[in-house]
Amino acid sequence: MRGVIVPLVTPFNEDYSIDVPALEEHIDFLQKAGVHGIFINATTGEFTSLSVEERKFLAEKGRELVNTTFYLVGTASTNTFEVIELTKHAQDLGADYVVIAPPYYCPLNETALFRHYSMVAERTDIPIILYNIPSCANPLSVQLIKRLALEYSNIAGVKETIDSVNHVRDVIIEVKGEREDFMVFTGLDQHFLNTLILGGDGGIMACANFAPEVHLALYKAFQEKRFKDAFIYAQKLARLSKVYDLASSFGSAIKLAMSLRGFSIKPVLRPPYIIDGDEVKEEIRKLLREVLY
């Protein structure tokens, strides 16, 4: 798996129930756009605000709908046994990969983190993509990622949502250097091109929910060695990623941007998250106009 993977938003109705028609419409849009993977129950999908039953429902619904690209399911939790349960569920319904962020809230050392992932890897067969997001969860060091990758063949890759070129470089050199099939994806739109240049496999990036054409154009240009064009698209993504700085949360930023671009997904976040007001919406409108039009 390589290229542009979209961490899907979860559409909600005004009463906070899951908006299934909007989910169906968005998945159809992304598949027609030509993205290389769709990732449900992601951070962007507000998985921490969903019950286990809702996460299973979304995973099942996504499996019904995603039929032209790779299908990834997020199975992270602070409870190791819940991760195993969700991972087995994703495996049984035929997902291609699971994506597992580390436990959050309580600090854990590397021994505990290794045990957490090893318990999941030993009890399931589905390929696992580690998810390093140190701003929200316990960090995964290069050496821990390497140890997991070399000891468990079903630990297939890592998503790096970390604002550090050096860290991503070291993962690519240290881990891919010893296991060529280990995949490295950036989780940050603004790091897409440099991750590819360093030898990474692509990106799992939230702005691709509302502007996948930019990410896809960059990837195509890079693959075809049209590097001047790739630089232009990378500059667009660098500017577009400023959307996160304008809103109180990335969820608010993405859903407001989607509403401004005409998607039917409502600007509704589940509590405790809130959608920002008209002032922020206008700032996002201005940014989108400058970058995309």
From Swiss-Prot:
SMART domains: DHDPS (SM01130). The keyword Lyase applies. InterPro entries: Aldolase_TIM, DapA-like, Schiff_base-form_aldolases_AS. CDD domains: DHDPS-like (cd00408). The keyword Transmembrane helix does not apply. SUPFAM superfamilies: Aldolase (SSF51569). PROSITE patterns: DHDPS_2 (PS00666). GO terms for cellular component: cytoplasm. The active site is at T43, Y105, Y131, K159. Homotetramer. Belongs to the DapA family. This is Uncharacterized DapA-like lyase TON_0506. It comes from Thermococcus onnurineus (strain NA1).
